[in-house]
Swiss-Prot record:
Protein source organism: Leptospira borgpetersenii serovar Hardjo-bovis (strain JB197)
PANTHER family: ATP PHOSPHORIBOSYLTRANSFERASE, ATP PHOSPHORIBOSYLTRANSFERASE ATP-PRTASE
InterPro entries in alphabetical order: ATP_PRibTrfase_cat, ATP_PRibTrfase_CS, ATP_PRibTrfase_HisG, ATP_PRibTrfase_HisG_short
Protein name as it appears in the record: ATP phosphoribosyltransferase
Gene behind the chain: hisG
UniProt family annotation: Belongs to the ATP phosphoribosyltransferase family. Short subfamily.
Length: 205
């Protein structure tokens, strides 16, 4: 049996649907249940439901054999994990956005940036040769430039609807993201038969 860490929310739902279609799960966990561990009757997969930012930590520390996490989260955290498979679900992009009329150029002061992704944001501005001040926020990132907290934001974008609704414009795409299957190296070796079968099955989408 493989223990799989999944992020709560839409990505978990997409991942579970995929595993059901591939015969690794027999049914969806009860949506009304408060339990965070789901043992599927087929006995192939045990699911841990965790915060999206915590999936990689559970896998890296061997509390789970594998996990499904966004590429944005994995790149931001710099985890030591095997990332053998892009599942092609949960697609979005990490972008720089700012109010209409804002241009990205060298200024007399640091560019103020609000984001949940300080490492990726800092790396982007470094490669642009621009100095920045990062404000790490945990939600409602689009609000920051509207109230003067920041000049711009670095955040995930799916359709761009939220940006448009708040008068923001996408300036640069920093990273294309999608859901990745990740393994800790111990499980990838110790459970290599199950891991190989799981990866092979999910790769045939």
């Amino acid at each position: 049996m493989l223990t799989l860490a999944l992020p709560k929310g839409r990505l978990a739902e997409e991942s579970i649907d995929l595993m059901i279609s591939k015969g690794w799960l027999s049914a969806k966990p009860d949506p009304d249940s408060k339990e965070l561990i789901y043992n599927d009757p087929l006995g192939k997969i045990r699911i841990l439901l965790v915060r999206s930012q915590d999936v990689a930590t559970y896998v890296e520390q061997c509390a789970a054999d594998a996990g499904i996490s966004g590429w944005d989260v994995l790149k931001e955290g710099g985890y030591d994990l095997a990332t053998p498979l892009d599942l092609g679900i949960g697609k979005c992009r990490l972008s720089l956005a700012a109010p209409e009329g804002y241009t990205l150029e060298a200024r007399h002061r640091k560019i103020r940036v609000a984001t949940k992704y300080p490492n990726l944001a800092r790396e982007f501005f470094f490669h642009k040769g621009l100095s920045c001040e990062i404000f790490k926020l945990y939600g409602s990132i689009e609000l920051a430039p509207l109230v003067g907290l920041s000049d711009c934001i670095v955040d995930l974008v799916s359709t761009g609807g939220t940006l448009k609704a708040n008068g923001l414009k996408e300036l640069n795409i920093i990273l294309e993201s999608s859901a990745r299957l990740v393994f800790n190296r111990s499980s990838l070796y110790g459970k290599r038969k199950e891991a190989a079968e799981f990866m092979d099955s999910l790769s045939k989408i």
